[in-house]
Amino acid sequence: MGCSAFDRGFHASSEASTSGSTEPKDAVIDVQGAKERARARATMLKDKALAAQVRAMMVFDRDLVRAHRDRAAFLQQRALKARPEHAPDDLLDELARRLLDRLFDIKRDFKRIVVLGGANEAITRRLLAERDDIEKIVVVDLSQDMLDFVESVIGAEPKRRDGTPVEISYVQGDEENLPIQMNSVDAVISCLGLHWVNDLPGAMSSAAATLVPDGLFLSSIFGGNTLQELRVACALAETEHEGGVSARVSPLAHVRDCGSLLGRANLSLPAVDVDIVTMGYGSPEKLVEHLRAMGETNAGLMRRPFLPRETAVAARTLYAEKFPAPHTPGSDNAEGAVEATFEVLYMTGWRSHESQQSAKQRGSATVSLADLQKHLDGEK
């Protein structure tokens, strides 16, 4: 990707627009600030040496990520029309539920919330259905089509569980350059929205900066063991037919990285946990269709543009042979059905506040372990 192409992608993904708001100054939304930061970065990248360094650190094609989100919005809209009584995507809905379970375990109010990318339809819908404390939600996404889809599902007059109207704004923006005021929201929630950014520590730091003191950052991303079956099948097929291996699945973070990411974002009381979800599909092609509907197909800059037919057929055969979906009595498991693993990494952190628990300074203890042992021995 040339420098000019990179600049165009950055500007496009940083431009933001809001729906239903005519106020010149918003207490939460900061579109102008995002545009100014985009212009400043574009100016810096006129330095060819710096631009080359930045390009070398890029992993994902953000223009393609946006295109995938546009397509996912269309496919989810079509799925919702076909099954209006169901969620647009059952897996995204379930993973949104699991993420929000962590929010519901916290006994405090979150009046202003940013919903950032990923499964934003499921998160927004569930927040409204299950909470009574929300006053304002800002939905941020790289794709305007996805924002339009979420708005069509939520409706023109959103209300929370107790019937109170909730103000919702839909803002197109980049996760790496959030159009949100600093120190303005009580929580940032991102369900599967951050594993497609090129600067994950920077994106998390940007999100953390929008939180008020003692505000909550709650996120889930797909982990490195996601789609391990697909990786193996493609690697074996390429090795057999082409004598080498290419990146067929986008690179993802591992659980060991998450604690460090929370620390680099200056978030306190970090917590990380993992879920493994195994899904069954009628065929490898059905898996790929589902990945497209979620917006989760490969957007890596180093991806191959296509897979030769011979290799693709071999990969399909190997996948079905090595990773068949277990047959469930009474089900309609078809021959050739396969399973796929989704590893979900959950990250929780808090904006620092004096009321939070913190470790004592080294050397501040007033009782030694030896004295404590003597005391305990004396009680026996």
Report each predicted region and the residues it spans.
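N-terminal chloroplast transit peptides
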Residues: M1-G2
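Class I SAM-dependent methyltransferase Rossmann-like catalytic core
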Residues: P24-K111
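C-terminal lobe and adjacent flexible extensions of AdoMet/dcAdoMet transferase-like proteins
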Residues: D30, F104, A265, E285-K380
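Class I SAM-dependent methyltransferase SAM/SAH-binding core
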Residues: D101-A187, P201-S205
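Short catalytic micro-motifs in class I SAM-dependent methyltransferases
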Residues: L192-H195
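A short glycine-rich, Lys/Arg-flanked "PGG" loop and its adjoining helix->strand segment in the class I
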Residues: P201-L216
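Conserved catalytic/acceptor-binding region of the Class I
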Residues: L218-K286, M294-P305
